[in-house]
C-alpha cells in the first residue's frame, strides 16, 4: 500500500547515504515505488509508513545497521528493528538472541538459549508477536511436568535464516492488533516479487562444549549438523514468484544444576510451628548460632538437589511463498510456514529431603536471614539418599497458512485483504508421556549438612558405620510420576485494510479485523507415592546402576570439589529400571502416563475490531509529521473446564465433611469486554539530522489462560462453616496501559546516530485474587447445589435436645445415636474415646452449603517508567564501528518486599539492561563481538512448592563473537562463538544465600560456510 510521505529533503539525504552503501542482498530490498508486486506485500507488514526510500539494497554489518537505523528514523512512533543480514551475520541461535541487542529488550533463557522476551519491563505474556502482520499462537508445556497457561511466544522454535527483518513497535498505532503492552514484535519473511532472485545453501558444524560435561550415558554427539537453504525466483516477466526457505538443526548439549527446587519455607523469628527452628531457651536452641530475631524473617530449605541433564534437539523450519501479480495494480500472496522443534531430555539427580527434625544451624544477620549452615540430625542413618532420574520428550509444532490480496484501485486508494489460519501445538513425543520421573533411593543417610556460604551449596552426608559410599547394591525404586501434558492454540484471523491519499503528504488509513483464538491445555498423570521403596534392594540387578561423582560436572563453580562434598551418586538405565518396577508390582500401567486427561481447559476468544488513522506532514521549515487514530476492539470469551463433579457432602469426622465426586464434566463460563484505543504520534524534523518525537497510545494486555478458565474446582474437605474452591473468571478485564513516549534522535554522520528516549506506562487492572462467598438459600445456588447436614433437620434436632451449637461432637453423637438407619445416616461403631463413628449425608431438604471461591480479580494499578540510550557510530572508512545501548526501567511500587510474608503483587521481569557491539568489516573480513547484560530481576512470586516466595535471577552478562571471510562472490565461511566466557546462571530467594538454582551451561561454537549459486 502507499506510504505516508515525509519531507523531500530528508528522503533525498537518507537515500544518498544508503545508496552509497548498496550491494546485492535479496532479503534487504525495500522500495517506495508503486510497482504492483511490491505494493502487494507492504500491506502484510505492520509498519506501513516506515520505508520511504527508492530501491535501497544493503549488505554486511554496516549496511544492516544502517537499515536498522533508518527503520527507526523513518517510522511513525518509536520503532527499532534488525534486518536479515544483521541476524545472519551474528551468532544467534534464534530470534530472541537477536532481539536482546535492541534497547529495552531482555530475554528469558531456557535450555541455554533465548526463549521469550521482556520489553521495557513488561513480561513475555504482554508482548504481541506477529508473522508478516498476523497474530501468532503460542504453546508450551514448560518442563513437561505440567501445562503452560502462558500467551508468551517461544522464539526457540524459529530459526533465523529465513527472516528478512524483525520490527519492534514500542509505541502502538490503530492498525496494530491489540495485546502488546510492552511491544508488538513483527517478524517479516522474504517475498519473491520484492527480492532479487537467489539460490544459496549453508552448512554448519555445531559443537556445544556442555555436551562433553556430562556422564557418558547422557551425552549426545560432540559435533552436530545445521543446514539451511534459500530459493527465490521470479517468472513470467516478474509477475509470478516462488520463494522456498528451509533449515534443519541438530543440537546436543547439556547443563548441570544445583538448587532447592522445592523452595524455602519462610517464618517469622517468633513463630513456633512445624519447620521452625527452636525458640530461645527451648531444647535445641543451643545448636543455633546468630539466631534470627523475633521480628526477622528467615527461611529453611525443603531439600537440596544436584542434577546433570543431557538434551537433544532437532529443529526443522520451512516456508513456501507463492506470489502472483495478475495485473499491474493487483498482487496476491499465498504462504505456508512450518516449524517443528523436538526436544528429548535425560536427567539424573542426587538429592536430600529435609523433614525439619532436630537441627544445628548458623545464620546471616536479619532482618531477612538465611542459613549459612543447616544440619539435620538423623539417627540412625536410615533415611534416603535420593538419586532419581527423568526422561522428557516433547514436540512443538507450528503451522501457518496465509493468503493476501493487495489492490491499488487508484493513485489515491489502496485496499488489501489478509487471512491466515495458524496453530501452535505441544504434545508428548514418547510412549511414556511428556515426562517420566523415577525416584531411586539408597536408605543409608544419617546427619545431613547443607553449606550455603557460597553460590554453590555443598551437602555432607554421614553414612552408617561400615559404609563409605553409596553402592548399587543399596539402590531401589521409590516414588514415581509419569505426566501427559498437551497444549494447543489456534488462531483464525481476517484483516481488511485500506488507505486513501488526500494529497501529497496526507492520508487516511482504515481497516477492520476478526480474530478467533482457541486455546486448549490438558494434563493427566500417574503418580505412585511409594517413597519407602518398591520391593527391596536385592530385587534389582546391580548392572542397572553406574556409580559417578557429581562434583566433576560443576567445574565453573567454586566449591564443586570441596572435600566435605558427599557427591557420590548412581546413574541408572531408565528403561530397565522402569521395566523392573513394573514387573515387581505387576502393574505396568503405574509406570506410564495415562491417556485420559484429568484436567482439560478450553477457551475461545472472538475479537472484532476496526480502526481509522489520519496521517499528515506539515512541510514547514521544521517539517512536522502527525498520525492520530483510534481502534475499537470487542472480545467475547467462552471458557470450559473439565472438573470433578461433586455429587454430595458426607459428614465423616467431627470437624470435617467430605465431598463425594462423580465423573468429571465440563463447566462453562463466559465474559466479554470492549475498548476504544486511541493513539497520537508526532515527529518534528528540527534539522535534516535531528528529530524530536512524541507519542501517546492506549494498549491492552489480555489475561492469562488460567485466569479466565471456566469451571469451578472444589476442595475435598469441607468445614462446618463451609467449603473452599477455585475458579477462573472469563469476565476479567485486560490490563490497560496509557503509554507516553518522548525521544530525541541525532543522526550526526553516515550510519551513525545518538538517541535518548523516555517512556512511561500507567497500567491498571493488574490481576490479583479475591474470594467470592456463595451462600445457599431458598432461591440461591451454590457450586453444584450441594446440601449439607449442617443446619438440617437432624442437626436442629440435636440442638433442640441440648447440644450446644459449637459442640459438633455432641451433635454427631446425637444424630448417629438416634437416627441410625434413617435416610443419610449410617453408624459404623464407637471410637476409643466413646464417640460414635459413621457418616451423615446431606439430604435434599437440608440447606445448601456455602463455599469461599478464590478467583482472579482486577485489583492493582501502577506506573513504570524508564530511559533508553542508544549510540551507533562507524569510524569513516576504517571498517571499525560500535553500537551500544543502555535501558533503565523503574517502578518502586511494583517491587517485592522480602521482609513481608504471604502473597504479594510485584512486577516480574523488571530490570536494567545494556548491550555493546564492536565490529570490523573490510577487505572481505567481518568480525563482531557483542556483550549483552541484564541486571538482577524478579522472575516469579511463588517457588517450586507454590509457597509465596520471590525468585530473583542474578545479573547476567554474555559475550559472543562472530568472524566471517568472503572467499569469493559465491563462497563465504564463518566462525561463531556463544557464551565464550562460560557464564553461569543463578536464581535466589529473599536472601542471596538462599540459592534456588545455579546452572552451568557452557560455550557453544559453530563453523560453517554459505554458497550462493
Each PLM stretch: what is its role?
Residues 183, 189, 220-234, 247-249, ...:
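Outer-membrane beta-barrel transmembrane strands
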Residues 763-765, 932-943, 964-1013:
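C-terminal beta-signal and adjacent terminal beta-strands/loops
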Residues 135, 518, 567-572, 576-581, ...:
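Surface-exposed extracellular loop regions of Gram-negative outer-membrane beta-barrel proteins
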Residues 57-90, 116, 127, 139-147:
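N-terminal periplasmic "start-of-domain" segments of outer-membrane beta-barrel proteins
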Residues 762, 767-772, 778-942, 981:
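Gram-negative outer-membrane beta-barrel transporters
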Residues 145-153, 161-168, 175-186, 192-288, ...:
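Outer-membrane beta-barrel translocator/receptor signature
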Residues 96-140, 170-172:
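Extracytoplasmic beta-strand/coil segments of soluble accessory domains associated
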Residues 271-301, 364-383, 445-477, 535-597, ...:
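Flexible glycine-rich, low-complexity coil/linker segments exposed to the extracellular/periplasmic environment
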Amino acid at each position: 500500500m502507499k506510504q505516508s510521505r515525509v519531507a523531500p529533503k530528508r528522503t533525498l539525504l537518507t537515500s544518498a547515504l544508503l545508496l552509497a552503501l548498496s550491494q546485492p542482498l535479496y532479503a534487504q530490498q525495500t522500495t517506495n515505488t508503486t510497482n504492483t508486486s511490491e505494493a502487494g506485500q507492504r500491506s502484510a507488514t505492520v509498519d506501513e509508513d516506515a520505508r520511504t526510500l527508492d530501491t535501497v539494497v544493503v549488505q554486511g554489518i554496516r549496511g544492516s545497521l544502517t537499515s536498522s537505523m533508518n527503520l527507526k528514523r523513518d517510522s511513525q512512533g518509536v520503532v527499532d528493528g534488525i534486518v536479515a543480514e544483521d541476524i545472519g551475520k551474528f551468532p544467534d541461535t534464534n530470534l530472541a538472541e537477536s532481539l536482546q541487542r535492541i534497547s529495552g529488550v531482555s530475554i528469558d533463557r531456557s535450555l541455554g538459549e533465548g526463549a521469550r522476551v521482556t520489553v521495557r519491563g513488561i513480561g513475555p505474556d504482554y508482548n504481541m508477536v506477529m508473522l508478516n502482520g498476523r497474530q501468532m499462537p503460542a504453546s508450551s508445556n514448560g518442563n513437561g511436568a505440567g501445562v503452560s497457561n502462558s500467551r508468551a511466544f517461544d522464539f526457540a522454535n524459529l530459526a533465523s535464516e529465513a527472516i528478512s527483518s524483525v520490527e519492534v513497535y514500542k509505541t502502538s498505532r490503530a492498525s496494530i492488533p491489540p495485546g502488546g503492552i510492552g511491544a508488538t514484535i513483527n517478524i517479516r519473511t522474504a517475498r519473491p516479487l520484492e527480492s532479487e532472485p537467489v539460490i544459496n545453501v549453508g552448512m554448519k558444524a555445531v559443537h556445544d562444549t556442555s555436551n562433553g560435561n556430562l556422564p557418558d550415558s547422557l551425552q549426545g554427539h560432540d559435533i552436530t549438523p545445521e543446514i539451511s537453504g534459500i530459493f527465490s525466483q521470479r517468472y513470467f516477466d516478474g509477475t509470478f514468484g516462488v520463494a522456498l526457505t528451509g533449515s534443519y538443526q541438530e543440537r546436543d548439549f547439556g547443563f548441570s544444576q544445583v538448587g532447592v527446587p522445592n523452595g524455602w519455607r519462610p517464618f517469622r523469628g517468633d513463630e513456633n510451628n512445624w519447620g521452625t527452628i527452636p525458640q530461645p531457651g527451648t531444647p535445641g536452641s543451643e545448636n543455633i548460632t546468630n539466631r534470627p530475631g523475633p521480628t526477622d524473617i528467615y527461611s529453611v530449605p525443603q531439600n537440596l538437589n544436584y542434577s546433570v541433564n543431557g538434551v537433544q534437539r532437532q529443529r526443522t523450519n520451512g516456508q513456501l511463498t507463492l506470489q502472483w501479480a495478475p495485473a499491474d495494480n493487483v498482487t496476491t500472496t499465498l504462504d505456508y510456514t512450518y516449524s517443528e522443534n523436538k526436544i528429548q531430555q535425560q536427567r539424573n539427580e542426587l538429592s536430600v529431603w529435609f523433614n525439619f527434625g532436630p537441627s544445628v544451624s548458623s545464620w546471616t544477620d536479619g532482618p531477612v536471614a538465611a542459613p549459612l549452615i543447616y544440619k539435620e540430625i538423623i539417627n540412625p542413618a536410615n533415611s534416603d539418599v535420593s538419586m532419581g532420574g527423568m526422561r522428557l520428550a516433547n514436540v512443538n509444532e507450528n503451522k501457518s497458512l496465509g493468503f493476501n490480496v493487495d489492490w491499488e484501485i487508484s493513485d489515491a486508494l489502496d485496499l488489501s485483504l489478509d487471512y491466515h489460519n495458524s496453530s501452535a501445538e505441544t504434545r508428548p513425543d514418547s510412549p511414556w508421556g511428556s515426562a517420566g520421573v523415577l525416584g531411586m533411593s539408597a536408605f543409608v543417610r544419617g546427619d545431613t549438612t547443607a553449606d550455603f556460604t557460597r553460590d554453590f551449596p555443598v551437602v555432607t552426608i554421614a553414612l552408617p558405620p561400615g559404609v563409605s559410599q553409596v553402592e548399587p547394591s543399596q539402590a531401589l525404586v521409590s516414588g514415581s510420576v509419569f505426566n501427559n501434558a498437551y497444549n494447543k492454540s489456534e488462531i483464525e484471523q481476517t484483516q481488511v485494510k485500506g488507505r486513501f491519499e488526500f494529497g501529497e503528504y496526507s492520508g487516511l488509513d482504515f481497516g477492520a479485523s476478526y480474530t478467533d483464538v482457541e486455546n486448549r491445555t490438558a494434563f493427566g498423570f500417574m503418580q505412585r507415592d511409594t517413597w519407602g521403596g518398591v520391593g527391596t534392594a536385592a530385587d534389582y540387578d546391580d548392572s542397572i546402576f553406574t556409580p559417578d561423582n557429581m562434583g566433576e560436572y560443576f567445574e565453573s563453580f567454586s566449591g564443586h570439589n570441596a572435600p566435605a562434598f558427599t557427591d557420590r551418586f548412581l546413574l541408572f538405565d531408565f528403561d530397565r529400571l522402569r521395566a523392573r518396577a513394573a514387573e515387581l508390582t505387576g502393574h505396568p500401567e503405574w509406570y506410564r502416563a495415562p491417556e485420559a486427561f484429568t484436567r482439560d481447559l478450553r477457551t475461545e476468544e472472538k475479537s472484532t475490531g476496526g480502526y481509522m488513522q489520519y496521517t499528515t506532514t506539515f512541510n514547514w521549515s521544521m517539517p512536522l509529521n502527525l498520525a492520530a487514530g483510534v481502534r475499537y476492539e470487542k472480545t467475547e470469551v467462552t471458557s470450559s473446564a473439565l472438573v470433578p463433579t461433586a455429587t454430595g457432602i458426607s459428614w465423616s469426622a467431627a470437624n470435617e465433611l467430605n465431598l463425594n465426586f462423580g465423573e468429571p464434566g465440563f463447566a462453562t463460563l463466559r465474559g466479554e469486554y470492549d475498548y476504544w484505543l486511541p493513539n497520537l504520534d508526532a515527529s518534528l524534523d528540527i534539522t535534516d539530522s535531528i528529530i524530536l518525537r512524541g507519542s501517546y497510545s492506549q494498549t491492552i494486555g489480555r489475561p492469562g489462560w488460567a485466569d479466565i478458565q471456566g469451571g469451578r474446582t472444589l476442595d475435598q474437605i469441607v468445614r462446618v462453616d463451609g467449603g473452599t474452591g477455585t475458579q477462573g473468571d472469563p469476565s476479567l478485564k485486560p490490563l490497560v496501559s496509557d503509554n507516553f513516549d518522548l525521544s530525541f534522535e541525532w543522526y550526526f554522520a553516515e550510519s551513525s546516530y545518538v538517541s535518548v528516549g523516555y517512556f512511561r506506562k500507567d497500567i491498571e487492572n493488574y490481576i490479583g485474587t479475591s474470594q467470592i462467598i456463595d451462600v445457599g438459600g431458598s432461591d440461591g445456588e451454590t457450586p453444584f447445589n450441594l446440601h449439607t447436614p449442617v443446619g438440617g433437620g437432624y442437626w436442629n434436632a440435636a440442638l433442640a435436645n441440648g447440644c450446644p451449637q459449637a459442640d459438633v461432637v455432641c451433635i454427631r453423637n446425637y444424630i448417629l445415636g438416634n437416627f441410625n438407619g434413617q435416610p443419610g445416616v449410617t453408624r459404623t461403631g464407637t471410637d476409643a474415646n466413646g464417640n460414635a463413628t459413621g457418616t451423615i449425608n446431606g439430604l435434599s431438604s437440608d440447606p445448601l452449603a456455602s463455599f469461599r471461591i478464590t478467583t482472579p480479580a482486577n485489583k492493582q494499578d501502577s506506573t513504570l517508567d524508564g530511559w533508553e540510550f542508544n549510540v551507533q557510530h562507524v569510524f569513516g572508512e576504517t571498517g571499525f564501528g560500535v553500537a551500544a545501548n543502555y535501558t533503565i526501567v523503574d517502578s518502586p511500587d511494583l517491587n517485592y518486599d522480602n521482609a513481608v510474608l504471604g502473597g504479594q503483587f510485584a512486577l516480574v521481569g523488571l530490570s536494567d539492561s545494556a548491550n555493546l557491539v564492536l565490529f570490523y568489516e573490510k577487505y572481505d573480513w567481518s568480525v563482531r563481538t557483542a556483550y549483552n547484560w541484564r541486571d538482577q530481576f524478579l522472575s516469579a512470586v511463588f517457588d517450586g512448592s507454590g509457597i509465596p516466595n520471590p525468585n530473583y535471577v542474578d545479573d547476567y552478562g554474555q559475550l559472543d563473537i562472530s568472524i566471517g571471510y568472503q572467499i569469493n562472490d559465491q563462497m563465504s565461511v564463518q566462525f561463531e562463538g556463544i557464551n565464550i566466557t562460560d557464564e553461569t546462571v543463578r536464581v535466589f530467594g529473599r536472601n542471596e544465600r538462599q540459592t534456588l538454582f545455579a546452572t552451568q551451561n557452557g560455550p557453544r561454537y559453530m563453523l560453517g560456510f554459505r554458497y550462493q549459486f
